[in-house]
Amino acid sequence: MTGGPPYNSQSPTQQPRYPVYSPPSKTRPYYPNNDQYQQHPPQTPPAFPPQPPLARSPHYSHAPSPLPATLPPLNGGAPPSHHQESSSQYQAHQSSGTPQFPLPRPYSASVLSSNGASPYNHPTPSHAHPSSGRLDSLSQSPPKKDQESLYPIGGNVASGFSSSIMLSPPCILSDSIQKPARAADPMSFASILSGPTEERPLPRKQSPLPEPAPVQTPAPAPPVLAPVPAARKATPPPPTAPVPVPAPLPEIKEPEPLPTPLPRLEKKPSAEKRRRNVDQESRASESLPVPPTNGVSEPAKVSRASNVRKTMSERDTEAINKIIAEIDNAEKSDVESPGFEAEYERYIAKGKKRALDAEKAESIRRKRRRHDFLVKLGKTFEKQANAGMDRFRVANEASVIAEVQAKEIQDEKERKKDMQRKRRRENTVRLEMQKKIEAERKANKANDAAEKAKFLREAERAQRKIKSTKRALEGVTSPEEIGEVTPLAPNLEGGTTSSFHIGRSSPSRRKSGRSGGSSRPKKSKEQKQAEKDAAEAAYAAMENDEPLPLAPKEDPRKESLKKEAKGARSKEPTPQPLSAFESKGYNQIYEQIWRDIARKDIPKVYRIKALSLSTRQENLRKTAQLASKQSRKWQERTNKSMKDTQARAKRTMREMMSFWKRNEREERDLRRLAEKQEIESAKKAEAEREANRQRRKLNFLISQTELYSHFIGRKIKGAEADASGDAAVDGSDETVRPGKAGDHTIDLPSSVADLSTKVTNFEDLDFDAEDETALRQAAMANAQNAVKEAQDRARAFNAEENPMAALDEGELNFQNPTSLGDIEISQPNMLTAKLKEYQLKGLNWLVNLYEQGINGILADEMGLGKTIQSISVMAYLAEVHNIWGPFLVIAPASTLHNWQQEITKFVPDIKVLPYWGSAKDRKVLRKFWDRKHITYTKESEFHVLVTSYQLVVLDSQYFQKVKWQYMILDEAQAIKSSQSSRWKNLLGFSCRNRLLLTGTPIQNNMQELWALLHFIMPTLFDSHDEFSEWFSKDIESHAQSNTKLNEDQLRRLHMILKPFMLRRVKKHVQQELGDKVEKDVFCDLTYRQRAYYTNLRNRVSIMDLIEKAAVGDEADSTTLMNLVMQFRKVCNHPDLFERAETKSPFSLAHFAETASFVREGQNVDVRYSTRNLIEYDLPRLLFSSSGRLDVAGPDNEKVGFQNKYLQHLMNIFTPENIKRSVEDDGAFSFLRFADTSINEAYEQSHLGVFERAVRRRGQSDRLSQLGVIYDNEGDQTANSVLPHSLFNIVERNDRQAVYDVAPEGYMRDLMTVSESSFERQGLNVIEPCASPAASAPPIFISCSGQTALRETNDTFFSVPVRHALYSTPSRQLEEQILEKKLDPAPFSLPPMLPKPLSAKGRYTHIEVPSMRRFVTDSGKLAKLDELLRELKAGGHRVLLYFQMTRMIDLMEEYLTYRNYKYCRLDGSTKLEDRRDTVADFQQRPDIFVFLLSTRAGGLGINLTAADTVIFYDSDWNPTIDSQAMDRAHRLGQTRQVTVYRLITRGTIEERIRKRALQKEEVQRVVISGGAAGGVDFNTRNRESRTKDIAMWLADDEQAELIEQKEKEALDRGEVFGAGKGGKKAALKRKKDLTLDDMYHEGEGNFDDISAKPSGAATPVSTADNIATPSSTPVPKRGRGRGTVKGSSKRAKTTTERLRLIDGDGGL
């Protein structure tokens, strides 16, 4: 229970005595009552009244509790009301519920004072014992002095007046104990002036007293007049008669009876008013309390021990009594008589003033006493708290630490469990999401409603599971009960609380179910709203520091009990209140009992009751179930015959149902079969009609195109059309009559077409009619109209802006080309080159096309000079017809420089404007454009503008404003897609004629050729679906199925293409050109490649790929192509997946570091810079003379003594001693015969073994040579022994060993058997296989002294030692040899270290990947290594083409390893670098290999210096490879060109090559007109292209098995691989992507951009790139990226891939 202290209406609203409660620290101990420090302690209800004898015992004293009560009243009832009392007998208690001290209960009762002041401005409360109700003082026990100081702590020792008068109800006393009414109010004026009743009152002096009426009064008690305290309001005596203070009488006499007062005096309002005032004043007064007397307070008589009463004389007493009697007998009292109002008011004012003064003084004293008391109490509490805290810490610190550690361990376990649960739930969400998506997909594909509903239910279940799992994952649980956590929460039900509960309520222990315990009664809406409003009001009051509005707890039962008790009290006489126990010990025991009951017993009893209730309910439920079963038993008792009858009826019903179902199924099947046959017959008839309609439509389109081609062909070369044998067009005498432009007409025979026939739209033609005459006439009219429109458009090209140009330039102006007539064209004189015969024919064909205003396609094979023919056309127009442009040449980026150079070279008079570069550069170039004049002259700024496809699209708004005379598109396959923005922008340019240059008009399919025809003649070759399908589908299907194409269709196709396309092949027109030989070189997979390939194929399910391909999802197609790319990487080189890394042991060393090499100087000495992490620190003492046994010094006298005497004084090898010995023929006299001087002998004694060996190595062998000088002719050696070398026997006979004398031959082998055998077996070149797991340099000894550093440097960096061991001269010696130009042989001696055993040994254990293994890891690279070795030896030069740029990077490493010179060109090479790289290869014969990417380096460049072409990996498109190999096999090539194609056997590359051969067959059939045969093609159609790619991943056995299953599925009428989706899923496919789109160079969709280029392939800077959305920035390269999943780069569009193909990344 929570809540603050209950404030009633009489409680003052003042601030608490102590500051607001704040939670104690964790280290603060609890108080002994196990409750934390509370700001508002709990309250205690009044105790039970004790028995009267015990309460009135004079020896019984109660120790009052300084704290308020802590328990609520019993049974949750409202606390009993307390009367506000005017006096107090025990100041430690108070009547209100306000706490006196907001502190916890002390340890013992001896600490507190019994007379502490009240914290509020109220009278000090009295003890809970009510008085006995007697009004005389004789009924009280005499006071005991030892009880006056029961509690020694200072306080207000005065006591107040008893509250028994206020507690006891008024009653009528008998005559023997009755007292006058004024005695009940001791503060009244009459009580003060009253005296003994037996004496007569004094008469009044102011006015005569009336005659008193005889009133019977009882004998009063002896008059004891108490002094009036300052805090009380007293009625002043009459001013004329001052009343002295009477002294107590020694004896008490029997009073005389007085006359009874009149009844009207008791009903006076003034008396009641005075009594009311006196009661209020007494309640407000706190001064002059009466000390307790035997625990019972006196009624109203108090006296001070310090005041001595004065005795009055008998005369004074009689006078006073007489006056009192007169006052009592008077009709009105003296104060009620007129004339006393002012005195009365003055009296009231003085009384209030005295009361205020007394109250203020008492308040000051009370505060001082309270402060002293609280200071002492606080110190006592602090001392006890510190002691308790220390005891608690000592007792529980270890257990708390262990508990905290255990809690942390448990929390860590719980956290891990939570993470596991989280992962399981996340997996559940993912799996359920997949199930949901799968169910929704199946539901969308389901045809049956029931099946669809089932799938939807599965999806709904999965969604619910996902929702519940996500809720559990997010931690959302069911709402729990809101537990109150603040100790100051409002108690809206009133009453007091003993404790508050922090945290959530304990979970209910009731069992869920219908048989659970009884639930709480539901509250109405009004009650809930009332509780909510009350809570809001309470919180608002708490925020505003206002008293909380307490709502009494409503309980109907309690209200009824209160009413019954009230009625009973009204009927029965009110008993006398009994005194309750008020001792402190009693209250503590009482509170402890209730606290234990509330904390322990009540929950226990509640649990017992709840368990009993649940058990009882469970038993009742079971009993009810048994009773229900028993009551239903009679229903189960059925007759056996009835059961048998029902069973027979059910069996009969089932049989009947099965019979009729079978019958209906058979009838339904027959009906469906009949309907199916009818539908198939109708479909067949409709298909025949549609086929005839499509045939007529296609025949119309082909006839119209044929007629158009016939007209154009007869105009250009009339004989060619006659030779074609076209039966549909008869020979005619059509001529072109010279004359005016408007007179040009074409004469056709009347049998062919009616000239008056109007042009008919394609949509208005009736293709359902059987008669085709109208269609032929419409085709003839449309063809004639198309020819006329083309010529009119050519004539009117310049007529709009410059109508006078024809008159100014003469009648041969080319603006009217039809006026020229048939002119024989010769080579222009402006052209500096000599055209070949076929090129001159091409020039004539192009000029005739231009004259007729018709566009064309020059499709000569690559290398036959399409560029020079185009340039000759521009030269012819400029020279003959004075047409100087503007001409627009659009080419790939790699050929832009080639166009510029060839135009400048062959036609110097024509000015070329190269239009490329940055946006700023192009803006400057556009200033040379002349948009105002369409006629360009020789003096114009430029004549030909050369640019790339990207820039044309980028600046299309500027190009569209210029009228171009001629637009030449080089490599026109760049516009093979009619849906691309490039195709549409170029088609919108204003130009008179268009010329397309392409060596491969058909690359992947016939649709590309149709796009080119559509571009040159958009009005004729319109995008009709029928024509497009006839072009692509029919012809391709014939090529794929290896069937012969219809001769009529093939002839008509050639008839259509012949007027618009000119194609010559090298072998037909160029005899001097060398042959081209193609060879397929098959390679095998190495062990590493085979492992990679098998692992990849095992991880892929071919059936799953085929099923996904059947669905036709674009994402699945992309994934499939990525998978194909991975297989191609394996075939190329396994290092494309994972490079062999450099290996080294773990180095436990510290490497040298420097902040800047500037500080290190020119030469950085890194020797011994690698140091061990472990350093052995030695003290400087060990390196000084004091710590060394062999170094003399000031601190080492012993070594100095030894050195002095042993090394010098006693040393026989001193020069002086040796000289003396030699002179005296002593022991050293042998030196003269050993060729040794005195100094040499002395040095030999002081040098070490190594120094002597070094010196011995440097001595010349001069003694052994004397034998040659002294030899005689008879081969007898003369006496060549000199005296000074008499003892040098070894030096004189120094003969070389046989090993040195015979450096080669059999003799050397015999002398060096072990060494030669070791070398022959190759043991000296074996690479070490084992390497340590860790390595470290030797432990370094460090010392901080200079001596140690100098000695270490002398040892490590000794120049003579290094020179002797390694035979490396010093830097200074080398410089002197070079400066003096000396022979270095005498200065370079052989090293003293022996030759190492292994030639492959290393100084370190770092293993660099072997390049030899790098070559052998790939079957292709190993074969290429052999091939390049042969080609290098034969003097050939090689063009090496790749699909992947990363493979080019690996090839650079290989060429560097083999020391082959090379250059590189790929898509990232900048434009200027491409030109320089091509020029270097053409001009420098030392460059052996040219590395190129197939797409970027296979277009337009001339590389005739090479005679060998190697394709490391083939392209999807065979025409790309053809273009690449024609870079070498072209005009200018005099040698035979050999083409090698590396193919890995048994892999996907074989199938790709098979597909490429199929495409080549399509080109041969369409372009060359040959028969389709000789190549074995598969029969897979275009719709299953993605499935074909999936089949490439399988081996031959798997492919055969899959084809067999597919055939079986087709026989059953199903779609193989379509899955559960059925035929609808198979038909619902995305737009088919061609193989060229899906794999654009290895640099397009699958460009491996992980390696940075080298050589000439310099990355393009961002400043040179075009900042447009369509531009493709050069990707950053780095190891290990490639096309790995996770790359953030977006997929390239078709436009970007085409741009990358053209190598335009730098524009």
UniProtKB/Swiss-Prot annotation:
Q: Where in the cell is it found?
A: Nucleus
Q: Where is the composition biased (Basic and acidic residues)?
A: 264-284, 426-463, 524-535, 552-572, 633-647, 734-746, 1693-1707
- Residue runs in coiled coils: 395-478, 635-706
Q: Where is this motif: DEAQ box?
A: 970-973
Spell out the reaction equation it catalyses.
ATP + H2O = ADP + phosphate + H(+)
Q: Which UniProt keywords apply?
A: Activator, ATP-binding, Coiled coil, DNA damage, DNA repair, DNA-binding, Hydrolase, Nucleotide-binding, Nucleus, Transcription, Transcription regulation
Q: Check the record and name the CDD domains matching this protein.
A: DEXQc_INO80, SF2_C_SNF
| MF-aspect GO terms | ATP binding; ATP hydrolysis activity; ATP-dependent chromatin remodeler activity; DNA binding; histone binding
Q: Which PROSITE patterns match?
A: DBINO, HELICASE_ATP_BIND_1, HELICASE_CTER
Recorded GO CC terms: chromosome, centromeric region; chromosome, telomeric region; Ino80 complex
- Sorted alphabetically, which PANTHER family does this protein's record hold? CHROMATIN-REMODELING ATPASE INO80, HELICASE SRCAP-RELATED
Q: What is known of its domains?
A: The DBINO region is involved in binding to DNA.
This one is known as: Chromatin-remodeling ATPase INO80
Highest classification ranks of the organism:
Eukaryota, Fungi, Dikarya, Ascomycota, Pezizomycotina
> Gene encoding this chain?
ino80
